[in-house]
Amino acid sequence: MKPEIIIMLTNNDITVKNAEEVFESCKDLPAKKWGFKDVGLPKDEMIKLAAKMKEAGKETYIEVVTYTEEGCLEGAKLAYECGFDYLTGALPFDSVFEYAKEHNLKYSPFCGKVGGSPVELTGSIDEIVSSAKECIEKGADGVDLTAYRYADGDPIELTKAIVDAIG
């Protein structure tokens, strides 16, 4: 697996107000994956920015940080309505998987026990690896691993375990 970076135009789990300006100043960088959160910009600005990213040849990502099934499904609908390629975050509810599949959205849900804002990841490494495997078995295109906010152990050890388990 070749690691790739996703440039997220966010700060403290909120899209920065000048996200469009930041993107315009950096769009010629070789990074191909760009995104932002579902909070911080009005929907019309999200649509416009996602379109600009695609026009620049970028893959687009929206990360949804919510923990109810209703909120996660609303996030999936927002991802589709704004024209994103990928939905990341949200919890792996069956309804979100179904919506993503029906609307050709690639989906990488949170794995492990996540909560709070900013997000905190808790649980044992084995529990988080098991959760990641379950997400992939359900049809996820990847997982959203918030290793840098892992509260119960070594984030490097966790990341290595996830890569070993699901690639």
Question: Residue locations for each model-derived region?
Answer:
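Alpha/beta enzyme core
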Residues: K2-T60, V65-G167
